[in-house]
């Protein structure tokens, strides 16, 4: 790929698109400051204060946060749905159990926000998909103080990188590490497992801000579509991946829809 600083036609179009998007977001931020706060995410970000300094975010910081929410939310949502339907097509027994839950709770109607907590197996299906195909393949953290991990001394400022693929498929933590087995996330199994064995959205105060929104959005989409259609692979696919910011299929996953 040509570096972004080389003024090719493609790079110029990308630069223009980024500038247009930046102007769009900054206009929203300026209007909100002049019109007053509302009951939404942007207003929450505007009123948030740094725990150490007590300062609120600058317009530049608000722009960056909004950009992350827009694009990270889109990628995470599409990635989770793609891999979930791929896995369901490979594991029909799981799909049958999911359909039974959807039928029992929704009875053919469109799901609403109040229905999401009443679909525990759907959440297990999503969690198991995220275990096998975590949207973000690695997590990185800078140490703010000296530490020791498993006998290794790590000085302040070290960069610690967690390989989620390895952690999420480690046989010490998962009964069937290479299988699509939503029962990994039933109450008993989850309680017996170290909390840090499953980190698809990160952990701690810097956990993904869009986690709950993404899961809710995907639950509404899955609840609507899975009641009406069965999805099957249109051509063989072995689940090979490539990492381009998020975990994506190496080649498109093409599926056929048939009415239920």
Annotated model-derived regions:
Residues 23, 27, 109-150:
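Conserved cytochrome P450 K-helix E-x-x-R motif and the immediately C-terminal K′/meander segment
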Residues 43, 162-190:
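Conserved cytochrome P450 K-helix/beta-meander segment immediately N-terminal to the heme-binding cysteine loop
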Residues 1-55, 59:
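Cytochrome P450 catalytic core segment centered on helix I
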